[in-house]
Amino acid sequence: MEYLWIIPFSPLIAFIIIGLFGYKFLREPLSGIVAVIGVAISAVASIIGFIDVAKTGNYYDLKLYNWISIGDYNVSVSILWDPLSALMTCVVTCVSTFIFIFATGYMKGDESYPRFFAYLSLFVFMMLMLTLSDNLIQLFFGWEGVGLASYLLIGFWHYKKSAANAAMESFVVNRVGDWLFLLGILLAFVTFGTLDYLQIFNKLAGVDYVIITAIALLLFGGAVGKSAQIPLHIWLPNAMEGPTPVSALIHAATMVAAGVYMVARLMPVFASSEVALDTVMFVGTMSAFIAATMGLVQNDIKRIIAYSTLSQLGYMFAAEGLGLFSEGMFHLTSHAVFKALLFLGSGSVLIALHHLLDVQKMGQIGRAMPITTGTFLIGSLALAGIPPFVGFFSKDPIIEGAYEINTFVFLFLWGGAFLTAFYIFRLFFLTFFDGDRLDPHLREHVHESPPNMTIPLIVLATATVVLGFFKEFFINFLKPSLDPAYMKFLPNDVKALVSEGLSRAHHVHIEPNAFSFLGHSLTSFLGILILATAIAGITLAYVMYQIRRIDPVKIGDMFQPIYKLFYNRWYFDHIYYAIFVYGYYKLSKILWFVGDKVIIDGIVDGSGKGSVFAGGVLGKTQLGRISGYVLQMLIGVVIFLSLFLFLK
């Protein structure tokens, strides 16, 4: 398995080549070709390694070189290759390859074309360092690296004030989560004396419950920021200011899923604390539902999909909190495919409509863009959870599991499923079919995207149709990494501890076979209920936005307080502005007045005024009379004698 080093370093080499020679020798399209080759090589190596693990069930911990020495403890740049990291690596590299190909068409003519592909390659390298790490230090390096690359790519068009502000917001909000994450790493090192995953797992049974809970919650704080969960979610919708391939790669398929992956990677730690699992479950649940309500009333095509990403990440975290780690990771895999498809489809629409974002100004472009329309429909059906598309096989099991484990979680995830189906088909009908709102000049020039943009759409759409039927394979494939009974690297006492933590899901039976699950969903009450909910959401969107039997404006007026709540994103931004921006400004003004004007200026100005006053008083004693001078000398002698006698 020595070839595995190629996986992370191939994109790094592409980044270095483009960074050094891009503007001089590798201008469009050569820099794009170099980037595609770099990530494609990683994808091929990932698939080969994936097949090897699937055949043997083994895991490999490769130490590439010693990186940091802290006393007797050494941190290595490493590659942990097991089913979990192999799956995540394949997701990152394969989806990235098609996004890179799409980007060669999307970014055509951009004056900063080489810089864009250099940043993309840097991001993939950092994401792979995060994914392949066997220790928390390398994980943190990749964690911060993807944050840096995300900042650079969100603000890629930095001459736009909105893009620059969005990049800064993303960077600052993520620092809050990263601060918690770093505290968790430090506490883990103090507790275990190591940051290697396998060594941490081996020592779990001997650590106090409160300490494990604190470590897990601090690490999860980092995941909340990186994966844009409530309350650190506000940066993700504004991150859509970056080019659309960035949204597809970073804010759908890879970086925002890093938090979900981290929780799965450290599953034994989280499973050792019921409080930590409950926190993950409830944060994910509320994020899934609240983000879905926000997506209902947005009109920006990319922001609608962004809110759906935030919501689906909530489903993944809810699954992990429920103890359904394999189902959560399978949903991560399927979501990466169909959400990348939806973002790239929106990018195809934006190119055709000269970057018009408002879906209320679109419509009737379906016939002019048949490939984009058809593939976008497939992605929408997958997101809504309609069989036989992959979203049905990955999302519905989470809702069914919640039904058996926690009623509160089930109700919110079930409600979120209805809202998801509604808002994605609201977007679909408004964009491709409904009405005649499109500007006539734009309508004349609408055409299908070129092959380097449509071929990735077709490939991702095909994967969206096919992938769900491999559900059983993926669930079984992940067992050596996520099922304590199959985790060879865990000692028996830790296996017992982890199994007890996951006991909440022991009584849950979810059909692993895709065809059996489909049959179950079409015959059981719960399966029919969940499927009918998705169909109801699609039907309502059709009635309101296609045939217009219900007026959306009247509905908004009837429920205006709720509409305003959703439209203003539950006022999270307003509250944060009032506290952290306006509040900080007012506090600064108070501190300025008290500290600068009253104290500092008071001392400086007061000493000057005091000197003037004292000089005036003393000046009155200088009258030029001998009697006055004698009196002053007498007073001086008295003071001197008094001090002498006192000190003696």
Question: Could you describe each region identified by the protein language model?
Answer:
Residues 446, 488-494, 498:
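Acidic, turn-prone loop/beta-hairpin segments
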Residues 556-566:
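Short, highly charged, low-complexity non-transmembrane loops/tails of multi-pass membrane proteins
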Residues 580:
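Glycine-rich and polybasic anion-binding loops at the starts of cofactor/ligand-binding domains
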